[in-house]
C-alpha cells in the first residue's frame, strides 16, 4: 500500500496503475506494510483474533528460526513466541538433566539461547553439550581425557596434558613424539537428536607446522557399530609441496573455526532412532617418522549442514 499525494491510500499493480486489491475485506485481509514517515506498520491479520495460547501451539510445531521470524509479524505473535510453551518444545526432553540447577533463567527462551551460546560440561566433564541455534539439534564434543582413547597418551615422553584457557576442558593432550598415531572416540547415539544426519570433526591446534604429521594424509573413519563405516583421509595442516597437493586433491583440508581452533571433518552418519553407538578413529602408522606438534581439544558431533536451502 502506498500513501498518495491526495491523502488517499491506493494499491499499485506491476505496471504502476492503481487498482483495488482482490480479497481485501477485513475477514481475509493479510498483513501489509505501509509507508508512514519511515515507520513499518503491520496491518491486522485474521491470526490476531486467535487466542495467544493457540498461536503459541501452532508456532511450537515450527523451528526456533521460524519462531524468531514470526515474532516480527505483530505484537500478538511476539508475545506468543516468547511464551515458555513454545521454547519448551524446542528444548530437548532431557535438558533438565544436562543443565546444572545452579544456572537460573527467567524464561525457557533465555535458557534455550544460553545453551546455544554457552556449551555446558556434562558427565563430570566427559562431554561438552550445546544446541544448534537454528533448529535445536543436540551437539556434543568428547573430552580427550575422559571420553576418548589415544595411543601412548599416558606415557609422558610421547604426550603431555596441558591446560589452556581457550579449551572447553580442564586439560587437553599435546603430542610430543610418536611414530604410531591413533585416536579414537565414540558415544551412544541416544544422546543425539534422532532422525538427524551428523558430521564428526576432530578439533585441534598445531605447533610449528605439526612436523611429520601436518602434511601427511591421515586415515579417518566414522560409523555406527555393526555397520559399514565411511572412510576418508584428512590433513591437519596441508601438503608441503605442489606435487603432493596434486596427488591428494580428495583429502579433506582443515578449516579455521570462529573460536580460533581448527577442525577437519572425519565423516558422516545418520542417527535414525538413537539405538546405536557411533565410533570414530584417526590413524597414521604408515610413515616411520616421529610426529609432534598437535593439540587435541576433542571430537565433535553436530548436525550436517545442508548444501541446499529451500
UniProtKB/Swiss-Prot annotation:
User: Do you know which Pfam families this protein is assigned to?
Assistant: F-box (PF00646), PP2 (PF14299)
Q: Which residues form the F-box domain?
A: 44-90
What the entry lists under SUPFAM superfamilies is as follows: F-box domain (SSF81383)
**Start and end residues of each stretch annotated as Disordered:** 1-34
**InterPro entries reported for this sequence:** F-box-like_dom_sf (IPR036047), F-box_dom (IPR001810), PP2-like (IPR025886)
Q: Which GO terms describe its molecular function?
A: carbohydrate binding
CDD domains in UniProt: F-box_AtSKIP3-like
Q: Which domain of life is it from?
A: Eukaryota
Name the SMART domains for this protein. FBOX
Q: What is this protein called?
A: Putative F-box protein PP2-B2
- Native organism: Arabidopsis thaliana
Amino acid at each position: 500500500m502506498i500513501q498518495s499525494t491526495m491523502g488517499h491510500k491506493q494499491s499499485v499493480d506491476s505496471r504502476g496503475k492503481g487498482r483495488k486489491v482482490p480479497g481485501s475485506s477485513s475477514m481475509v485481509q493479510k498483513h501489509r506494510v505501509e509507508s508512514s514517515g519511515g515507520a513499518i506498520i503491520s496491518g491486522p491479520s485474521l491470526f490476531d483474533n486467535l487466542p495467544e495460547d493457540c498461536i503459541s501451539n501452532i508456532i511450537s510445531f515450527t523451528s526456533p528460526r521460524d519462531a524468531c521470524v514470526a515474532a516480527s509479524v505483530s505484537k500478538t505473535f511476539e508475545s506468543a513466541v516468547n511464551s515458555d510453551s513454545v521454547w519448551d518444545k524446542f528444548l530437548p526432553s532431557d535438558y533438565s538433566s544436562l543443565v546444572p540447577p545452579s544456572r537460573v533463567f527467567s524464561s525457557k527462551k533465555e535458557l534455550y539461547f544460553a545453551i546455544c551460546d554457552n556449551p555446558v560440561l556434562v558427565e563430570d566433564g566427559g562431554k561438552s553439550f550445546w544446541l544448534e541455534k537454528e533448529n535445536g539439534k543436540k551437539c556434543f564434543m568428547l573430552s580427550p581425557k575422559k571420553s576418548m582413547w589415544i595411543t601412548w597418551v599416558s606415557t609422558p615422553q610421547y604426550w603431555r596434558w596441558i591446560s589452556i584457557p581457550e579449551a572447553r576442558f580442564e586439560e587437553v593432550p599435546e603430542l610430543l613424539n610418536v611414530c604410531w598415531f591413533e585416536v579414537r572416540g565414540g558415544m551412544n547415539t541416544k544422546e543425539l537428536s534422532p532422525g538427524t544426519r551428523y558430521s564428526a570433526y576432530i578439533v585441534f591446534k598445531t605447533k610449528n607446522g605439526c612436523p611429520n604429521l601436518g602434511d601427511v594424509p591421515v586415515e579417518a573413519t566414522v560409523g555406527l557399530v555393526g555397520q559399514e563405516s565411511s572412510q576418508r583421509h584428512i590433513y591437519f595442516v596441508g601438503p608441503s609441496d605442489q606435487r603432493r597437493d596434486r596427488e591428494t586433491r580428495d583429502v579433506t583440508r582443515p578449516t579455521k573455526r570462529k573460536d580460533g581452533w581448527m577442525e577437519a571433518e572425519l565423516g558422516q552418519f545418520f542417527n535414525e532412532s538413537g539405538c546405536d553407538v557411533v565410533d570414530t578413529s584417526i590413524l597414521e602408522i604408515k610413515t616411520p617418522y616421529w610426529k609432534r606438534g598437535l593439540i587435541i581439544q576433542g571430537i565433535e558431533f553436530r548436525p550436517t549442514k545442508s548444501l541446499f536451502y529451500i
